[in-house]
Amino acid sequence: MIPRYTLPEMGAIWSEATRFRLFVEVEVAVVRARARRGLVPADDLAAIEDAPVPAPERVHLLDAELHHDVIAFLTAYGEGVGEAARHVHYGMTSSDLLDTTLALQLTRACDLLARRLDRLVGALRDRALEHRDTLCLGRTHGVAAEPTTFGLKLAGHAFAFDRDRRRLAAARDAVAVGTISGAVGTYANLPAEIEAEVLKELGLAPEPAPTQVVARDRHAELLAALAVAGADVERLATEVRHLQRTEVREAEEPFAEGQKGSSAMPHKRNPIVAERLVGMARLLRGYAVAGLEDVALWHERDISHSAVERVALPDACCVLDYALERAHWLVAGLRVSPERMRANLEASGGLAGSSAALLALVDAGWARENAYLAVQRAAMAAWEGKGGFRDLLLAEPGVAEALAVPDLDAALDPARFVAGAGPVFERLEALR
């Protein structure tokens, strides 16, 4: 991923220096396992353990000649090992090294993303509890529906990201798998006991039925989980973008002192971070499709997946890492305007209470269809600016006789619509 969207900790996981260091860890772990069986002399093991990680520049130089990055790495590493290098990569194939190293990188990336999700869930929980009683207009199809609270809006996002945590944990388990099984996964030159020992040392499980590679449905599952998390970020960002519209102005993302919103229009305060997060989600969906394309390889393996996942896996992890960090910034610093929320609710002229008026008439003995038609006539007249919904409804034939004005006012009270939402916040308070 380009530096603009790469944060330091995630970038370090996917750096070439880290990859080569993990290459060495995997190779040394195999040599140690063979040494414990008396197959590698102690002096040779020491030489291998003490050898430096090859410099990327040397590996690149060799790769330009050899056109094989793993052989280039092993050659560069062997230069630092000396004669004991004959024990390095013994009985292994390139994918043993590549896939096991990739699993180490992916599990570390997942752990970092899990911490990001924890922070975001916590921020959403706190802001939702802060605004549990902040009344606002609920909208369906972008149109006024019924009263809700801003806390309820945020609670829904908190639970969504909690589900993302569970999906990520499952996907981490799926990719925490390596293989040290040889050219076509038959353990022809290294016994499965060595694989089990090495992978346990590295914190990985073995692929139960390896070919030459770890099955790629594992990586597809991870990319899908990252894409769903990205979609949840997009949903949150889209809500902020709509609420920041000039004619709505119920919430807006932070705008720093000295920040500029437009080269041409000095008045602009645009939701640029929220818009950027929507773009991040689009990238993640593309990477998920790429992961699915990589599942079907020829026979025991081809390398059609290689170029794809060298881009898709690091980029997807970096993109979601960035998106989650920015989403936390957005939530923690979100400027909320309860006054605008109340004003927009009142501007609906009571229309948001139409369902309560309908049920009040039904409770008064009206047939539901007759009640619906009376409420709808009053609502349509209110939409057309012919008066307030409450007064228009009371003018409908028979309504004033069926409903006392205090009872209708109580039914239309916005607070009544959210009075039963307590269990949502009880569940939210338990979210950690």
Which positions does each model-derived feature cover?
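Alpha-helical support elements that line or immediately flank enzyme active sites
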Residues: 31-32, 105-117, 226-235, 240, ...
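Residue-level signal for inorganic ion chemistry
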Residues: 38, 320, 371
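A conserved active-site cap/scaffold subdomain adjacent to cofactor or substrate pockets
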Residues: 218-250, 258-317
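A helix-coil-helix interface module used to build multimeric assemblies
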Residues: 1-187, 192-197, 206, 259-262, ...
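A short, charged helix-loop
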Residues: 197-213
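Long, amphipathic alpha-helical stalk/connector segments used for oligomerization, subunit docking
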Residues: 283-366, 374
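C-terminal alpha-helical interaction appendages
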Residues: 333-402, 418, 423-430
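Amphipathic alpha-helices that form helix-helix packing interfaces
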Residues: 33, 113, 117-120, 124-127, ...
